[in-house]
Amino acid sequence: TGDVIDFIHILGSVLDLGVPSDSTVSLAKLTATGTKDATTFLRGDNSFAVPSGGKIGQVLQSHKIDQFSTTNGIGGTGFTDITGLSQAITPSATSSKILIIANIYISSSGTGSRQYYRIEKGGTAIGLPSAMSSGTAVFGSNYNWHSTTSTVMMSLVYLDSPSTTSATTYNISTTHNGNDGDATVRINFQANSGNGVNDDNGTSNITLMEVLA
């Protein structure tokens, strides 16, 4: 008990026990249970398994480098789509989720005004708060309290379940509360001019990631 056989003599000759050389053992020779192929991996309990969910299937991005502005307020026609901040994606399975990440470089020319932002899918706002007795349902907002020269990067993040394999378009829309006579929402440039040596211009983007089930 506990002894190890190093070799065996048969009629005066050493019997080779057949220790396999490197990289010569096939999957079929392994005792592990489960399906053995390129889609599985060997676990510590000697079984093959399919990797769990959470894999990223595809990543798409729309990067907006030009300027955009709108004077549309909630007292007017409401929300306006920000040109260039939209991206389409075609999910590979109905069980997939879409992670939406939007970074918007914003400013407003109206001191004391508030800008509102929404994420839309196919033209319909998503991720909004539950029913409200008053007020405006938004995904994100910014209050321009300082001056017409203030800028900020607004980030919107949402995990959507489109339940489709058809092409789906997501976009960002904006409006303002109209508290200032010149409450213009500006995207990618500073409100006062955006062209001086001390004025800052920026870029915005919307990124879509398909998260596989």
Set out the residue ranges of the language-model regions.
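Glycine-rich, low-complexity segments
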Residues: 2-69, 213
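Generic preference for well-ordered secondary structure
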Residues: 14, 26, 32, 84, ...
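Short, surface-exposed loop/turn motifs at beta-strand boundaries within globular domains
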Residues: 23, 35, 55, 80-82, ...
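Short, flexible micro-motifs
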Residues: 47, 76, 81
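Local beta-strand/beta-hairpin segments that build beta-sheet-rich folds
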Residues: 56-57, 81-84, 126-128
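Terminal beta-strand-rich extracellular "head" domains
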Residues: 71-78, 88-97, 101-167, 171-213
